[in-house]
């Protein structure tokens, strides 16, 4: 898949939650929470500022991030679900 996000948008592939709890209990799909972690797949050029400059994004392709549960838009391509987020929707970089 080839996708190029615009401005300060970032495409993230959600990382699925574990199917087994730390205590060994199998978690059914109906009880799983939506993932709030993902891997950055593509990054836009940056946010245009009022003075004409562009603020370069803080995240890079390949980094793992945490984002808000209801942030962004969902996009499905070739059977894979992606999230398209604004850079401000990303809460932290993992690792």
Curated annotation (Swiss-Prot):
Return the Pfam families for the record: Cpn10
Q: Tell whether Cell membrane is among the UniProt keywords.
A: no
One GO term of the biological process aspect? chaperone cofactor-dependent protein refolding
Q: Name a GO molecular-function annotation.
A: unfolded protein binding
Q: One GO CC term of this entry?
A: cytoplasm
Q: Which SUPFAM superfamilies match?
A: GroES-like (SSF50129)
Question: Where can this protein be found?
Answer: Cytoplasm
Tell me the superkingdom of the source: Bacteria
Keywords, A to Z, come to: Chaperone, Cytoplasm
Could you describe the subunit structure of this protein? Heptamer of 7 subunits arranged in a ring. Interacts with the chaperonin GroEL.
Q: What does this protein do?
A: Together with the chaperonin GroEL, plays an essential role in assisting protein folding. The GroEL-GroES system forms a nano-cage that allows encapsulation of the non-native substrate proteins and provides a physical environment optimized to promote and accelerate protein folding. GroES binds to the apical surface of the GroEL ring, thereby capping the opening of the GroEL channel.
Matching entries from HAMAP family are given as: CH10
Family statement: Belongs to the GroES chaperonin family.
Give the protein name, as stated in the record.
Answer: Co-chaperonin GroES
